[in-house]
Amino acid sequence: MSEPVKLRAHNQAHCKDCSLAPLCLPLSLNLEDMDALDEIVKRGRPLKKGEFLFRQGDGFDSVYAVRSGALKTFSLSDSGEEQITGFHLPSELVGLSGMDTESHPVSAQALETTSVCEIPFERLDELALQLPQLRRQLMRVMSREIRDDQQMMLLLSKKTADERIATFLVNLSARFRARGFSANQFRLSMSRNEIGNYLGLAVETVSRVFTRFQQNELIAAEGKEVHILDPIQLCALAGGSVEG
C-alpha cells in the first residue's frame, strides 16, 4: 500500500497566476495579501493514481487545495470496509475535517494523477487573523462542507437509484461548470463501483441505471466519458436544481 505523500516547498505558479484563484481565494485579496498566502503554500510532485495524500488517523497539520485531478475521501470501518465520503475536484479544500480532533477521520486517495497545494494549518490560522477576508473564506468552505453533508443525507434518503444517480450527475455537472469546463460533457474520475459505494448502491444497480439513462436518451456514456443529452429532464429526475 502506498504511503501518504509529503509535500515540500517547490517553485511553481504563484497563487495569483493560478486559473483556480477566483474559486479558491477571496476575490478581495490584494496582491500583497496574496503574496503572504503564497509564502506559506507548499507544492510538491503530483500524486499518482492510488497514492494517499493522508490516511485515516494521521495527525492533522495541513489542509490541501486540489489543483488538478481528483481525490476521493473515505473512512474504514473496524472490519476494514470502505465507505466513500466524497469526491474532490480542482479548487476544493480537503482535510478540514481533521481540525476538531487533530487527526484525520478519513483517508484521501488520488483517483488519477493529482496535484495539490498544501497549506500548513497553524500558519494559515495566523494569516487568517491578519486577513479577515481569508477567515471569511475559510468559514464559507466549512459551511459548504456542512451543506454537502446535508445534501448527501438527503440524497441517500431518496427512494430510487435513478434519483440518486441523476442527483450525482447534476451535482458533478454544476461543479464542472463552476470551474469553466463543459457542464454537459465530462470524464468521471471515479469507477462505477466507487459511485455505488458513495451512493449506497450495488455496482450492478449503477450499471443498470446508466444503461437505462442511455436508452431514455438522458445521457450518452462510453467508459468514463459522460455526455448529458437532456439536462432539463435529468435535473427534474434529480428533484430540481442542484448546486455544486
Swiss-Prot record:
One Pfam entry name: cNMP_binding
Residue span, HTH crp-type domain: 159-232
Database matches in InterPro entries: cNMP-bd_dom, cNMP-bd_dom_sf, Env_Response_Regulators, HTH_CRP, RmlC-like_jellyroll, Tscrpt_reg_HTH_Crp-type_CS, WH-like_DNA-bd_sf, WH_DNA-bd_sf
Gene Ontology terms: cellular component: cytosol
Listed GO MF terms: DNA binding; DNA-binding transcription factor activity
TM annotation in the entry: none
DNA-binding residue intervals: 192-211
Gene3D superfamilies in UniProt: Jelly Rolls, Winged helix-like DNA-binding domain superfamily/Winged helix DNA-binding domain
Positions with a binding annotation for a nucleoside 3',5'-cyclic phosphate: 21-149
Key words of the record: Activator, DNA-binding, Iron, Transcription, Transcription regulation
SMART domains: cNMP, HTH_CRP
Induction details: Up-regulated by Fe(3+) levels in oxygen-limiting conditions.
Nucleotidyltransferase among keywords: no
Signal peptide residue numbers: none
Disruption phenotype: Nearly complete loss of expression of hcnA.
Function noted in UniProt: Transcriptional activator of anaerobic gene expression. Regulates the expression of the components of the hydrogen cyanide synthase (HcnABC) in a positive manner. May also act as an iron sensor.
Additional facts recorded: Possesses 4 cysteines which may bind a metal ion (possibly iron).
Protein's UniProt name: Transcriptional activator protein Anr
Gene (name only): anr
